[in-house]
Every structure is written in structure tokens, then in C-alpha cells.
Amino acid sequence: MSMFTSTRTLTQTMDKPDDLTRSATETAVKLSNMNQRVSRFHDKMENEIEVRRVDDDTRVKMIKDAIAHLDRLIQTESRKRQASFEDIREEVKKSADNMYLTIKEEIDTMAANFRKSLAEMGDTLNNVETNLQNQIAIHNDAIAALRKEALKSLNDLETGIATENAERKKMYDQLNEKVAEGFARISAAIEKETIARERAVSAATTEALTNTKLVEKCVNEQLENVASEIRAIQEEIDREKAERKEAEDKIVNTLEDVVSKIQGGLSMVTKHQ
């Protein structure tokens, strides 16, 4: 092996640590990119969970607002019906009173006329008075029957309104119960899905961390292998250096012996001359 060839081989061998450093740098960059992707994936899942939670809260609020609006409508309708019932009751009472007063006025007028006639016709006074009393009794009975019928209709109307209000309240209670049940199911589903998403994120994060550790282990093993190869190469370089130095020393010693012998021969030639 010539000195030029040995030098070139040594130069090529010494270039390999730079390749190793570059490879290790690339591996570190890949690991960093993987960690960043894992972090972005985790952040993305957390953001999706938060968006879903906000959407669920919005839907729940809409349901509650709808229930409140329905309650206001029912209360408004009840107030209107109550006011209408009071107006009808007052109108019926007013009509009955007016009718009673009108009939009474007519009866009073008739009684006055009859009395005047009876005063003028003394012979038929008793008969006319009897007839008058009978008419008064008939009219009074008619008025009482009419008043009783009006009050019965009024009570029936009031009972019907009360029954309708009770039915509306029952329907409202059933609606509230159904909404509460639906809200409970929605809440349970939201909680179940949130737990499932959190578990999925945790599992994905754990798997990513496990993969990262495996990659780090492989990289460390590769780095250890490369380091072993570097040590072997360095030992080979040191051995070649020692062998080359030994050969060079032998050459130098041989040259010195040759030069010494030449000088000795020249000295002997000079002496013989």
C-alpha cells in the first residue's frame, strides 16, 4: 500500500462521521415532526370536543327557551279565557237584571192600570185582582226560571272553562315531563359521547407516546450500532496508523543503514586513493 493510497482511504473513512451526524440530525427532526403531529392531533380532538359541547349547550338552551315560550303562551291564553269568562258572566247577569226590571216595570204598569180599572169597575174588582195576582205569579215564575237557566248556563260555562284549564295544565305537565325525559336522555348521551371521546383521545395519545418511545428506542439502538461501527473504524484507523508508522520507521532505518554503508564505502575509497 502506497502512502497516497493510505491517505485517500483515511480521508474517505474520516468523512463517515459527518454522514452519521447528518443522519442523526435527520432522525431528530423526524422525531420532532412526529411529536408536533401528535400534539396537533391532541389539540384537534380537544377542540372538536369543546365545539360539540358548545353545540349541545346551545340545543339545550333552545329547548328551555321553547318551554318558557310555551309556558308564557299558556298563561296568556288562560288570562284571556278568564277575562272572557268574567265578561260573559257580567253580560248574562246584566241581561237578566235588565229583563227582570223590564218585566217588573211592565207588571207594575199593568198592576197600576188594573188597579185603576178596578177602581173604575168596583163590581169586577175582586176577579180582576185575582187575575192580576195570577199573572204576577206566572211572570215571577217565568223570571225565576229564566234566571235559574241563565245561572245554570253560567255555571256550566265556568265548569267547562275550569275543565279545559285542568286539561291544559295536564297537557302542559305531560309536555314538561316529556321534555325533562328528553333532556335527561340528551344529557346522558352527551356525557356518554364526551367520555368516549375523551377515552379515544387518551388512547390515541397513549398509542402515539408508545410509538414515539419505540422510535426513540430504535433510534438509540441505531445510534449505538453506528457508535460501535465508528469505534471499530477508529480502531482500524489507529491500527493502520501504527502499521504505517512502523513501516515508515523501517524504511527510515533502512535508508539510514544504506546511507551509513555508502558513507563508509566512500570513506574507504577516499583512504585508498
UniProtKB/Swiss-Prot annotation:
Keyword line: Coiled coil, Cytoplasm, Cytoskeleton, Microtubule
A Pfam family reported for this protein in Swiss-Prot or TrEMBL: SF-assemblin
Main location: cytoplasm
Cell location: Cytoplasm, Cytoskeleton
Annotated InterPro entries: Giardin_beta-like (IPR038835), SF_assemblin/giardin_b (IPR008374)
Region (Rod): 20-273
Cytoplasm found in the keyword field: yes
Keyword Transport: no
Ranges for region Nonhelical region: 1-19
Molecular function terms from GO: structural constituent of cytoskeleton
Assembly information from the UniProt record: Interacts with BOP1 (via C-terminal WD repeats).
Family: Belongs to the SF-assemblin family.
Role this protein plays: Giardins are involved in parasite attachment to the intestinal mucosa and in the cytoskeletal disassembly and reassembly that marks the transition from infectious trophozoite to transmissible cyst. They may interact with other cytoskeletal proteins such as microtubules in the microribbons or crossbridges, to maintain the integrity of the ventral disk.
Protein name from the UniProt record: Giardin subunit beta
